[in-house]
């Protein structure tokens, strides 16, 4: 079974709990910190060792105590009992995906040769939100190889409005 498949029910359970208790931000922060702790090299080695789950939970909770309330501690105990503390980074990833879905927000990558100004970003966001009927956040990256224009990417969808792409198409047309 993949890590995502195993992590999904944990993420769904705590996401539903967080929504019900109006504490999504708290749970995301707790998961982010706990996932960072569990991904630390020494902690990863320790988690892979054989140890009683109650003791594992106690030690892990003590490492993260400033970021945990009673509900979070219970969640960590359940994860430890099931030997799943090493999955916290994947649980966080799934939790954030659920949060994005409920807010109908999608993250779009935009590649440009130079940094986009705020007006350009607003125009791109407006056009994409109108087309996709979802709230859009941009993840802007610089790629000087495109020369000018932008490449917009979401999942397997790509809108290539770059000069380098236009030059390639012109070259192919002239060679044919």
UniProtKB/Swiss-Prot annotation:
Keywords: ATP synthesis, Cell membrane, CF(1), Hydrogen ion transport, Ion transport, Membrane, Transport
InterPro entries recorded: ATP_synth_OSCP/delta_N_sf, ATPase_OSCP/d_CS, ATPase_OSCP/dsu
Keyword Membrane: yes
Membrane topology per record: Peripheral membrane protein
GO molecular function: proton-transporting ATP synthase activity, rotational mechanism
Localization (cell): Cell membrane
One GO cellular component term noted in the UniProt record for this chain: proton-transporting ATP synthase complex
Transmembrane segments: none
Assembly description: F-type ATPases have 2 components, F(1) - the catalytic core - and F(0) - the membrane proton channel. F(1) has five subunits: alpha(3), beta(3), gamma(1), delta(1), epsilon(1). F(0) has three main subunits: a(1), b(2) and c(10-14). The alpha and beta chains form an alternating ring which encloses part of the gamma chain. F(1) is attached to F(0) by a central stalk formed by the gamma and epsilon chains, while a peripheral stalk is formed by the delta and b chains.
PANTHER family membership: ATP SYNTHASE DELTA CHAIN
Family: Belongs to the ATPase delta chain family.
Role noted for this protein: F(1)F(0) ATP synthase produces ATP from ADP in the presence of a proton or sodium gradient. F-type ATPases consist of two structural domains, F(1) containing the extramembraneous catalytic core and F(0) containing the membrane proton channel, linked together by a central stalk and a peripheral stalk. During catalysis, ATP synthesis in the catalytic domain of F(1) is coupled via a rotary mechanism of the central stalk subunits to proton translocation. This protein is part of the stalk that links CF(0) to CF(1). It either transmits conformational changes from CF(0) to CF(1) or is implicated in proton conduction.
HAMAP family named among the record's database cross-references: ATP_synth_delta_bact (MF_01416)
Name of the featured protein: ATP synthase subunit delta
């Amino acid at each position: 079974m993949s890590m995502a498949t195993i992590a999904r029910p944990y993420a769904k359970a705590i996401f539903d709990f967080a929504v019900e208790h109006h504490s999504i931000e708290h749970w995301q922060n707790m998961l982010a910190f706990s996932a960072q702790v569990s991904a630390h090299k020494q902690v990863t080695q320790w988690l892979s060792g054989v140890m009683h789950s109650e003791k594992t939970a106690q030690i892990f909770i003590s490492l993260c105590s400033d970021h945990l309330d009673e509900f979070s501690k219970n969640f960590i105990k359940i994860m430890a009992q099931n030997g799943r503390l090493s999955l916290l980074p994947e649980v966080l990833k799934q939790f954030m995906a659920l949060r994005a879905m409920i807010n109908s927000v999608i993250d779009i990558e935009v590649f440009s040769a130079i940094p986009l100004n705020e007006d350009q970003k607003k125009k791109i966001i407006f056009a994409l939100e109108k087309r996709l009927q979802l709230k859009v956040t941009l993840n802007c990256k610089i790629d000087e190889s495109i020369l000018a224009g932008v490449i917009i990417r979401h999942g397997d969808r790509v809108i290539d409005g770059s000069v380098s792409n236009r030059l390639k198409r012109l070259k192919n047309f002239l060679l044919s």
